[in-house]
A protein has these predicted regions:
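Mature catalytic core of soluble alpha/beta enzymes
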Residues: 3-189
C-alpha cells in the first residue's frame, strides 16, 4: 500500500477510493490550446484566446500591434500591473495565492496543496507566470512552480530553460525574479 494506492503483483495500480483527482492545474490551459487548434484549423492567423486567465496569442492585433497582456501585482482586491508581456505565438499562465486562499484560526493558507506533504504550500511566492508555446504546459508548470516555491522553482526553471517570472513577498513588499529564458522573450532577444 502506497498513499492509499495498492500495487498488485501483476503491476496494476488500484485506488480503492477516497482520493480526489483535481485536474484544474491544466484544464484551462488545455481548453485554450483546443480553441487555438480549432482556430488554426479554420485558417485564422491572428487571435488571442483566454480561458480563466490563461492566454495564448497568435499573430497580432490589427495594424500589426502585438497581443500585450499584463501580469498583475499580487495584492488581494487590487488590479495593478507588475509586468507586461507581448504574446508572440506564445501562451502565458499565472498561478498564485493572492486571490485563492482560505483562512483558519486567523491564519491565511494557500489553495495550492503540496503533493509531497499533503498540506498547503508554505513559502513567500505570491505569483508565478510561465510563458510556453502550449497553454496547457504553461498552466501545469505555473502550478508546479507554485508548489516548488521561489528557490526550488527557479532552480528547476533554469535547469529546464523555462520562461518563468516569479513575484516573491519580502519584508519590503515584493521582489521580481525571472529566468534568462523569460527575459529573452520579454526583451525580444
Amino acid at each position: 500500500v502506497y498513499k492509499r494506492q495498492l500495487l498488485r503483483s501483476d503491476q496494476q495500480l488500484l485506488q480503492p477510493g477516497g482520493v480526489y483527482v483535481d485536474l484544474s492545474s491544466i484544464a484551462k490551459g488545455f481548453a485554450v490550446d483546443k480553441v487555438a487548434a480549432l482556430l488554426d484549423s479554420h485558417g485564422v492567423n491572428n487571435y488571442l484566446v483566454e480561458v480563466g486567465g490563461e492566454l495564448l496569442g497568435k499573430g497580432s492585433k490589427p495594424y500589426k500591434q502585438p497581443w500585450r497582456v499584463a501580469v498583475e501585482r499580487p495584492i488581494a482586491g487590487v488590479r495593478e500591473v507588475e509586468q507586461v508581456v507581448d504574446l508572440k505565438n506564445m501562451a502565458v499562465a499565472t498561478s498564485g495565492d493572492y486571490r485563492n486562499f482560505f483562512e483558519s484560526d486567523g491564519r491565511l493558507y494557500s489553495h495550492t496543496i503540496d503533493p509531497r506533504t499533503g498540506y498547503p504550500v508554505e513559502h513567500q511566492l505570491a505569483s508565478v507566470s510561465v510563458l510556453h508555446k502550449s497553454a496547457m504546459m504553461a498552466d501545469g508548470l505555473a502550478t508546479a512552480m507554485t508548489v516548488l516555491g521561489p528557490d526550488e522553482g527557479m532552480a528547476f526553471a533554469k535547469d529546464h530553460e523555462l520562461a518563468v517570472f516569479f513575484i516573491v513577498r519580502t519584508n519590503k513588499g515584493v521582489e521580481e525574479l525571472s529566468t534568462p529564458a523569460f527575459d529573452a522573450i520579454v526583451e525580444g532577444k
